[in-house]
A protein has these predicted regions:
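Glycine/serine-rich anion-binding loops at beta->alpha junctions
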Residues: 95, 111-126, 205
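Fold-independent oxyanion-binding glycine-rich loops
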Residues: 89-91, 109, 117, 149-151, ...
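Acidic/histidine-rich catalytic neighborhood of metal-dependent amide-processing enzymes
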Residues: 120-194
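Small-molecule pocket liners
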Residues: 103, 193-196
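Acidic/His- and Gly-rich active-site-bordering loop/insert found
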Residues: 2-115, 135-140
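Conserved strand-to-helix beginnings and helix N-cap segments that scaffold or border functional pockets
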Residues: 42, 99, 124, 156-160, ...
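Buried hydrophobic positions in well-ordered alpha/beta secondary-structure cores of metabolic enzymes
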Residues: 33, 74, 87-90, 127, ...
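Acidic-enriched catalytic cores of C-N bond-cleaving enzymes acting on peptides and small amides
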Residues: 187, 206-210
Length: 210
């Protein structure tokens, strides 16, 4: 078995010291209402991530989107021209605006609670700290690209093209959605479909004779 290099050990040691900072970032993200149709809220999540990237000296750009949350792309260079590794995540949630006021972020008995605390604001924190760690210590053989979109919960109608374009350039991609209760991770999906169904029938009562 190949032993990790010393810089990787340093990287992991640093991550071990960042738990409080991770929880702080998670708290800040969860305490922003960011329903898929709340563009202002979804973009405020990007603003908070942008503050983190500025603190870590990680360059990022905004991809303007008119109707839903803007796209956000952060890059940690390296890899001598190798194809990048893509770290994906979405900033929107299914919860209505105002949900944060009802149940803001809190930690009870070692568990975090709040809107988006599973799907998927912790995943944004994971990706952000992965980028920060490799930006700080290096050792990555490929460039790293963090892509943070704003409309996944409604099928990514405005960010789909952005995701596809980044995925085509990447060597591989990790999407930091939550795993299963067993600890297993999901490696593929069957896909999804939106459809409109017209149902025709005859009105009746179950107790009637028809």
């Amino acid at each position: 078995m190949t032993q990790p290099s010393s810089n990787k050990l340093t990287l992991l040691d640093w991550l071990d010291t960042q738990e409080d900072n991770m929880v702080t970032l998670l708290r800040d993200l969860v305490n922003i209402d960011s329903n898929s149709f709340d563009k202002a809220g979804v973009d405020r999540v990007a603003d908070r991530l942008g503050e983190f990237f500025d603190e870590q000296s990680i360059p990022f750009e905004t991809i303007p989107i008119a109707t839903h949350g803007d796209g956000m792309r952060a890059v940690v260079a390296g890899g001598n021209g190798n194809r990048p590794i893509l770290l994906c995540g979405h900033r929107d949630t299914v919860f209505p605006t105002g949900e944060v006021e009802k149940r803001p972020f809190e930690v009870r008995d070692g568990k975090a609670y709040g809107p988006g605390v599973a799907d998927m604001k912790p995943g944004l924190v994971i990706n952000a700290f992965i980028l920060a760690a490799f930006n700080k210590f290096g050792g990555h053989p490929n460039p790293l690209v963090g892509l943070f979109t704003g409309d996944e919960e409604i099928g990514s109608p405005t960010s789909q093209d952005v995701i596809i374009a980044e995925a085509k350039k990447a060597r591989l991609a990790f999407n930091s959605e939550p795993g299963r209760p067993s600890g297993n991770i999901v490696t593929k999906r069957k896909g999804g479909i939106f459809c409109h169904c017209d149902i025709y029938g005859v009105a009746a009562h179950s107790g009637g004779f028809f």
